From Swiss-Prot:
Pathway: Amino-acid biosynthesis; L-histidine biosynthesis; L-histidine from 5-phospho-alpha-D-ribose 1-diphosphate: step 1/9. This is ATP phosphoribosyltransferase regulatory subunit. Required for the first step of histidine biosynthesis. May allow the feedback regulation of ATP phosphoribosyltransferase activity by histidine. InterPro entries: aa-tRNA-synth_II (IPR006195), aa-tRNA-synth_II/BPL/LPL (IPR045864), HisRS-like_core (IPR041715), HisRS/HisZ (IPR004516), HisZ (IPR004517). The keyword Amino-acid biosynthesis applies. It comes from Dehalococcoides mccartyi (strain CBDB1). It is found in: Cytoplasm. GO terms for biological process: histidyl-tRNA aminoacylation; L-histidine biosynthetic process. It comes from the Bacteria. GO terms for cellular component: cytoplasm. The gene is hisZ.
């Protein structure tokens, strides 16, 4: 038997029903907020992710790349490892005339995992707000993400906030090399004792500030204001990002949005420049995003600020109950026929479909338990309609009578 690739999954009919349900809720939410749907190709040039330094070397090791050969020469391309960077490229290519662009999309993301235990193909629902740099723009995206999850039936969504520039300002005082800063941040998150001991000895004020940020989870702007007050002389480099962070959470406070300030949640801050947020449902990480004001100019575009987020479809699919999708599950009608009545069966099936109802031809082996009604065409003027749930049967002479009945305008 030929097996599927490691780290890849088949989406079965029930999975796809959940997939489309989640996607439709997200799309509907985005449209009502003024976002327009776009789609980027699965293949992008590798240079899109390397020339601007938008992804760390560690991330680039996980991309699927190959040579797009045209006979004499070629350029290396990748299966997109990220959704935001292609969306930024799309804006630069085709939408620069828009001062403010609200874009949304569904895309698959490919990242290599050596073990094959983690998914190598992941589906994301993304939204990008380009051209606005205010804290209100961050709040719009966070609110849109929370609204989508609420409409999907998720309660008590946990919102964790961090700030990329605050992380970078702290790390810059420890290590000037940007690539090394990522390693140090990972060490801090892992509680590296030697590093923390060195920091406490060499930079005691910075150590106290960092310890406060790493060990405490604030739930209001007051927490950040206290951090700034306690930073002392070490707070010089931290003042600007802290003020920006405070401005962002102030807006969320006004909107009544609950959150947790968690500097450690900023892991993976490669191209982010401001507020970073992550969303959790029952401890499962289901989405995240943030501000990336330098990405579009880094890619050769105009100096446009931007922010965005993604919801992780692969993680949301198993969390959706069938009952939540009731409106998506249409009643299905089973069409049977006797003798030489195939043409009549097709006619009545087409009429049913024109009413927006699913009609399927019966074949041996079909499980009738999945259907609410069955229509058996016995003759051109004889239609047997059976309520499979109530086990009631009615004979009708006209196709119009059948449609009238199945539309629920008359009881069987």
């Amino acid at each position: 038997m030929i097996a599927r690739c490691k780290g890849c999954s088949d989406l079965l009919p029930e999975d796809m029903l959940r997939f489309r349900y989640i996607e439709s809720i997200f799309h509907d939410s985005c449209i009502t907020w003024g976002y327009e749907e776009v789609r980027t190709p699965m293949l992008e040039y590798l240079s899109l992710f390397t020339s601007s330094g938008t992804l760390t070397p560690q991330m680039l090791k996980r991309v699927y790349s190959f040579l797009d050969w045209d006979g004499w020469s070629g350029e290396r391309v990748v299966l997109r490892p990220d959704g935001t960077i292609p969306a930024a490229r799309l804006y630069i290519d085709s939408l620069q005339e828009m001062d403010v662009a609200r874009l949304c999309y569904t895309s698959s993301i490919f990242r290599f995992d050596e073990t094959g235990k983690k998914s190598r193909e992941n589906w994301q629902l993304g939204a990008e707000l380009i051209g606005v740099t205010s804290p209100e723009a961050n709040a719009e995206l966070i609110t849109l993400a929370l609204e989508t999850l609420a409409r999907l039936g998720f309660e008590d969504v946990e919102l964790r906030l961090s700030h990329a520039q605050l992380i970078k300002a702290v790390l810059a005082q420890l290590e000037p090399n940007a690539d090394e800063q990522h390693k140090i941040f990972d060490q801090l998150l892992d509680g590296d004792i030697a590093l923390m001991s060195r920091l406490e000895t060499e930079k005691p004020e910075l150590f106290r500030t960092l310890k406060l940020l790493m060990e405490n989870k604030g739930t209001s702007a007051s927490f950040l204001k206290n951090v700034m007050a306690m930073a002392g002389t070490a707070g010089g480099e931290l003042e600007e990002p802290l003020n920006d962070f405070i401005a962002g959470v102030d807006v969320l406070d006004k909107l009544g949005v609950s959150y947790q300030i968690d500097l450690a949640s900023g892991k993976g801050f490669e191209y982010y420049t401001g507020v970073i947020f992550h969303l959790f449902v029952n401890g499962e990480h289901v989405g995240g995003g943030g501000r990336y004001d330098k990405l579009i100019p880094l890619l050769g575009g105009p100096d446009k600020p931007a922010a965005g987020f993604a919801l992780y479809l692969n993680r949301l699919i198993p969390m959706i109950d069938a009952e939540d999708m009731y409106d998506m599950v249409e009643e299905k009608i089973l069409i049977k026929y006797q003798g030489d009545n195939l043409k009549n069966a097709y006619e009545i099936a087409n009429l049913i479909r024109e009413c927006g109802i699913s009609a399927e031809l019966f074949y041996p082996g079909v499980d009738t338990a999945a259907y609410g009604w069955a229509v058996t065409v016995k003759a051109e003027d004889c239609y047997e309609v059976t309520d499979l749930i109530e086990d009631k049967t009615l004979e009708l002479k006209e196709q119009s009578e059948v449609i009238y009945l199945l539309n629920g305008e008359e009881d069987a």
